[in-house]
Amino acid sequence: MWLQHLSLKTFRNYKETKIDFNPKLNVFLGRNAQGKTNMLEAIYFLALTRSHRTRTDKNLIHFDEEQLHLSGLVQKKTGSIPLEIELTQKGRVTKVNHLKQARLSDYVGHMNVVLFAPEDLQLIKGAPSIRRKFIDMELGQIKPIYLSDLTNYNHILKQRNTYLKSDQKIDETFLSVLDDQLVDYGCRVMNHRLDFIKKLESFGRKKHFELSNQIEELSISYQSSVNITDKQNLSESFKIALEKSRSRDLFKKNTGVGPHRDDISFYINGMDASFGSQGQHRSLVLSIKLAEIELMESITTESPILLLDDVMSELDNTRQLKLLETISQSIQTFITTTSLDHLQNLPENLSIFTIQDGKASVNGN
């Protein structure tokens, strides 16, 4: 798949911009704070209805406006798909083929993206919430039912936590009813995640072995607050975990076990990767990103769109060549950079957009 056209209206520092893209490689060139990353963020937001940089949607709206509008035309094997997002103070409206979508799971997945940014190193050494968000964003694109199950789980979780925080006397029977619902959707979420991690590890192991000159083996482990060793009895394991945690939950007034507490760990040759070197972290994250591309292709039969935010200057020549090798394989790619000197051995079929003060001009024109 590839993004043929993007229209931005009052998004970040872009007042109004319309831009046509190259189906292969697109480079956003400019000084810092001109809007290069904002352009990538717009593409990411159009795909996922979420920003990778802020949790507050109103930060995306141009400072002197009250709403924003993004639209794009995605080309896929099955044909063209127009996508639209309008964001106002009241919320967001999403459209596919000009038809309003009622649920997030009906919208996400029409345009798949893989983002690689310097902050992705936090995937290895950052907080568990960063890794959970990574799973949610990537898995949600290739399996829309996951977003539906996750939304339902979070809804029940919020209900349960609100009830635990209430001043009224706790009805343990009602709490058990909430627990049953939490177990139902929680097991669905965990099963989706376990399947995803297994496939990601399979693709990632091969990529990392190549990147490390056949000396490092990557493995990924899903760390759960629930006993996940027996998937057939996952529901029973979750119920037991909730029962054991009930006195703790009543005291702390929140839910202590479940997929909202889970994490993933990365290992290199059996050792915790978080203790590895900066170079190992870069290689590991690059391996994961390259694995994501292959995983998405294997499930959707479409290549995702690759977004590279100022990462080429962070990679040595070996890692750059490996990444460029992937780019050359019919994957639409967007790169931000302050200098073309950071980009070596680029393919010939590319478009360069100069970004200055929230305006984009192709090839400097």
Swiss-Prot record:
ATP binds at residues 30-37. One of its GO terms (cellular component) is cytoplasm. GO terms for molecular function: ATP binding; single-stranded DNA binding. It is found in: Cytoplasm. Pfam families: SMC_N. GO terms for biological process: DNA replication; DNA synthesis involved in DNA repair; double-strand break repair; SOS response. Keywords: ATP-binding, Cytoplasm, DNA damage, DNA repair, DNA replication, DNA-binding, Nucleotide-binding, SOS response. The RecF protein is involved in DNA metabolism; it is required for DNA replication and normal SOS inducibility. RecF binds preferentially to single-stranded, linear DNA. It also seems to bind ATP. Belongs to the RecF family. NCBIfam families: recf (TIGR00611). This is DNA replication and repair protein RecF. It comes from Streptococcus pneumoniae (strain ATCC 700669 / Spain 23F-1).
